[in-house]
């Protein structure tokens, strides 16, 4: 059984200097990244994905950015999330850009690449 994290969003108590969150970014992490901190810590370290996401959400909020973090081991779930936060979302729910670490899907997923292109939002791997 694989775990899929629910989207994690910045909340108001993370905002610094009363800045409003003016941009929205989607951070996507792919296959096996949920094991960070547990899997081969001598190679990948002891920091968990949850720790990394929490740190990034706090840092993004300082710059007025709402960061939505998702992780899945399932290719179709990642495609669904890309579509949801892009073309299928109401304007207010759409993200401004996507940051993706597809992990093993980097070499094999035409579906994720197609979803990113169809989304018509800037993205970076």
Language model: regions and residue ranges:
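Glycine- and acidic-residue-enriched helix-capping/strand-helix junction motifs
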Residues: 36-51
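Extreme N-terminal starter segment of soluble prokaryotic enzymes
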Residues: 21-25
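Glycine-rich, phosphate-binding/catalytic loops in enzymes
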Residues: 43-45, 115-118
């Amino acid at each position: 059984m694989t775990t899929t994290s629910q989207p994690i969003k910045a909340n108001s108590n993370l905002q610094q200097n009363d800045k409003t969150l003016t941009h929205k970014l989607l951070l996507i992490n792919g296959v096996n990244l949920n094991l960070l901190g547990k899997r081969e810590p001598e190679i990948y370290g002891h920091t968990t994905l949850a720790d990394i996401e929490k740190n990034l959400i706090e840092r993004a909020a300082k710059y007025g950015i709402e960061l939505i973090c998702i992780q899945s081991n399932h290719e179709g779930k990642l495609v669904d999330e890309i579509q949801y936060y892009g073309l299928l979302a109401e304007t207010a729910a759409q993200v401004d850009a996507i940051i993706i670490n597809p992990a093993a899907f980097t070499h094999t997923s035409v579906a994720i690449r197609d979803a990113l292109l169809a989304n018509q939002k800037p993205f970076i791997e």
